Amino acid sequence: MKNCMMADQRGRSILKHQPVVGDEVLEFSRGLAPSTFGFRYAAYMDRNHFLPSGRAAVKHIADPTLAYVMMRHRQCHDFLHVITGCGRSVEEELAVKVFEWKHTGLPLGLLSLLGGASRLSATQLAHMRLFWEWASHNAPCSRHDKPAVPMYLNVPWEDMLAKEYDEVAAYTGITPLPVFLKKHQKQ
C-alpha cells in the first residue's frame, strides 16, 4: 500500500503531510451544507454512533510510515461507506471489504468475506457476485466512463469535505453501489 501511495503524486503528498481524521473533522463536517460530501460523512457517522477517535490504534508496526498507512486505511473506511453509498448491513460491509481488497490487496477483505458469508442468506450470497463485479469495476486504474479510479488511500478526503458530493464522486470515479445495481437491473 505504501508503494501505491509513493507511486502517486497525491499519495506522496499525503504521506509527507500525514493528515489525521480526528473528531474535529467530524465536528467541522456537521456544519456543512447537506449537499456536501462532509455533511454526508457526518450523517453516516452520527447515524451509526461512530467517532473517528473510536478506531483502535495501529499496533505492532515499527516503521512509522507503514503505521501511518495502516492508520489511513482504517480512517478512510468510513469515507468509503459514504462515497460508495454503502450502509452498515452485513452485505454492504462485505461489499466495502471487497472494494478495499481490490484497492489494497490486504487479505482482511477476503477473510471478512469468508467469515461473513456464513451469515448471509442464499439471496444475499447471490448478491455478493454482483458486489464482487462492482468492486472490480471500481478497482484502481480500472477505466469506466473515462476517469481512472485512484487508489482510495491517495484521495485527499480531508480536503474534500466542503465539496459537493457529486463533485467528489466525479473526482474519484467511483460508481456508488446503488447506482451500479440500478444499472445492472436495467440490463
Curated annotation (Swiss-Prot):
Topology class, membrane: Peripheral membrane protein
Q: Would I find Zinc among this entry's keywords?
A: yes
Q: Name one GO cellular component term.
A: extrinsic component of mitochondrial inner membrane
Give the source's domain of life in one word.
Answer: Eukaryota
What are the boundaries of the signal sequence?
A: none
Kindly tell me the pathway this chain contributes to: Cofactor biosynthesis; ubiquinone biosynthesis
Binding of Zn(2+), residues: H77, D78, H81, E93
| UniProt-annotated location(s) | Mitochondrion inner membrane
Q: Which cofactor does it need?
A: Zn(2+)
**Biological-process GO terms, alphabetical:** ubiquinone biosynthetic process
Under Enzyme Commission nomenclature, its number is 4.1.1.130
Per the record, the major location class is: mitochondrion
List the transmembrane segments.
none
Keyword set for this entry?
Answer: Lyase, Membrane, Metal-binding, Mitochondrion, Mitochondrion inner membrane, Ubiquinone biosynthesis, Zinc
Q: Note on file? A: This protein may be expected to contain an N-terminal transit peptide but none has been predicted.
Q: What is this protein called?
A: Ubiquinone biosynthesis protein COQ4 homolog, mitochondrial
- Provide the species name: Leishmania braziliensis
